[in-house]
Amino acid sequence: MPFSTPAQPSCSAASPLRLRYIDASTAQKIDEDLMSASGGFSLDQLMELAGLSCAQAVFECYPPTKYPNVLVACGPGNQGGDGLVAARHLYHFGYEPVVWYPKQGKTELFSRLKVQLHNLGLPFVSQDDFQDALEEADVVLDSIFGFNFKGDVREPFRAPLEILKYESRIEFEARKKMPPIVSVDIPSSWHVELGNVNKAFTPSVLISLSAPKLGALAFAGRHFLGGRFLPEDLEAKFDLQLPDYPGTEQVIEITGAKPLQTQEADL
């Protein structure tokens, strides 16, 4: 039974703009510069700010009054950490998050993030219960794989990503709609430079962090930029030409943004 198409999020479109789309190597260098002695940031600081950005984007597009149940799907790396942080903020924003986190990151940071969620009473669903959690969700936050993902998708992530890809094969009770998907930085299993070459799922909303990735050029849904922490000298070093964030916002919509004219000849 195919799902009916979910309503489009009620976000206002931003004016067309140009900014730099970056590859995985540049994204890695930006993170390294931020966490260097001269950059001064720690990983948990960047993760906190990134997760807050993601939670705010979800709130702007899918408010808790209409979309209270969020399934936060987390991977074992830093991308998953962003999702854990986002789940905490979503709880405080009035949502009822459920976390799918089948493979925990190895450092103490991930353990502490998980403890924070347990202390709020957030439920964690088992590895095999992804589909059941999906049936109850109003929104899915995809924070499984980030810009460092390479190779084939393996379990325990392969089956859930296949479910999202072939959602029309699932039959929900009471004719529930397939929930919209919000992806963090790059949709899980997309190639960071080439885009959806693996024919994976396509989210409704994408939240690029620091700067949009080259693989997002073909993304046609709602597109946000988050991670309001880059100093001006770092933006200039990589010629990112990022837009200004309004007021106290942690995200800015960049739907329809084009690459810099100096990039177009190479794309």
UniProtKB/Swiss-Prot annotation:
Cofactors that this protein relies on: K(+)
One GO CC term, this protein: mitochondrion
Cofactor binding summary note: Binds 1 potassium ion per subunit.
Catalytic activity: (6R)-NADHX = (6S)-NADHX; (6R)-NADPHX = (6S)-NADPHX
One Pfam family it belongs to: YjeF_N
InterPro entries reported for this sequence: YjeF_N_dom, YjeF_N_dom_sf, YJEFN_prot_NAXE-like
Keyword NADP: yes
Residues holding (6S)-NADPHX: N78, Q79, G80, G81, D82, G146, F147, N148, F149, K150, G151, D152, D185
GO molecular function, one term: NAD(P)HX epimerase activity
Enzyme category, top tier: isomerase
Subcellular location: Cytoplasm; Mitochondrion
Residues annotated as signal peptide: none
Binding-site residues for K(+), renumbered to this chain: Q79, D142, S188
Residue ranges of domain YjeF N-terminal in the record: 27-242
E.C. no: 5.1.99.6
Keywords, sorted A to Z: Cytoplasm, Isomerase, Metal-binding, Mitochondrion, NAD, NADP, Nucleotide-binding, Potassium
Family of this protein: Belongs to the NnrE/AIBP family.
Reported function: Catalyzes the epimerization of the S- and R-forms of NAD(P)HX, a damaged form of NAD(P)H that is a result of enzymatic or heat-dependent hydration. This is a prerequisite for the S-specific NAD(P)H-hydrate dehydratase to allow the repair of both epimers of NAD(P)HX.
Protein name: NAD(P)H-hydrate epimerase
Source species: Mycosarcoma maydis (Corn smut fungus)
